[in-house]
Amino acid sequence: MSSDAALILEAANFAAEKHKQQRRKDPEKTPYINHPLGVARILSHEGGITDTAVLQAALLHDTVEDTNTTFEEIELHFGQDVRNIVEEVTDDKTLPKMERKRLQMEHAPHCSQKAKLVKLADKLYNLRDLKRCTPEGWSEQRVQEYFQWASEVVKGLRGTNSILEGKLDHMFMDQGIAV
């Protein structure tokens, strides 16, 4: 096994362990690990990304935000570069939800190229998931508001990966959102 493959599998295993008790909010209660795996797959299979640190960060992007993982732990196991990317894409859960959403829009243009890639793939995965199956308790209006907010975040990520941006644009247009 190549060392890059081993590093990516280590990140996948770490994320699976950290997210093992978590489920997505869809009616099927999909295992949460499907999300970071899907984000990494979008980057590699659709975005053409081969950068090991970006793929590791995609797998780990929700570990600090949604589990007891620390940034120090990410750095210890995966290095400074992966830690930096994960740190850039992690919301501060001590802040109210609307403030976190506002900060995502505000910070998007200032993220590193690597963090922007993870953010693009994360948004694409989440929007596809919303189209596939509405989370329990979500109205059509809430889905539309999420699409609108995501389109504002993506505006700040433009110029990062034309393939992923094009796929997002099609999703926004299908929802009647101008790009």
Swiss-Prot record:
Pfam families, sorted: HD_4 (PF13328)
Active site per database record: 65 (nucleophile), 66 (nucleophile)
InterPro entries tied to this protein: HD/PDEase_dom, HD_domain, MESH1
Catalytic activity line of the entry: guanosine 3',5'-bis(diphosphate) + H2O = GDP + diphosphate + H(+)
Keyword annotations of the record: Hydrolase, Manganese, Metal-binding
Alphabetized GO MF terms: guanosine-3',5'-bis(diphosphate) 3'-diphosphatase activity; metal ion binding
Span of domain HD: 32-127
Keyword Transmembrane found: no
EC number: 3.1.7.2
Top-rank taxon: Eukaryota
PROSITE patterns (UniProt xref): HD
Family as reported in the entry's similarity comment: Belongs to the MESH1 family.
Designated name of the protein: Guanosine-3',5'-bis(diphosphate) 3'-pyrophosphohydrolase MESH1
Species: Xenopus tropicalis (Western clawed frog)
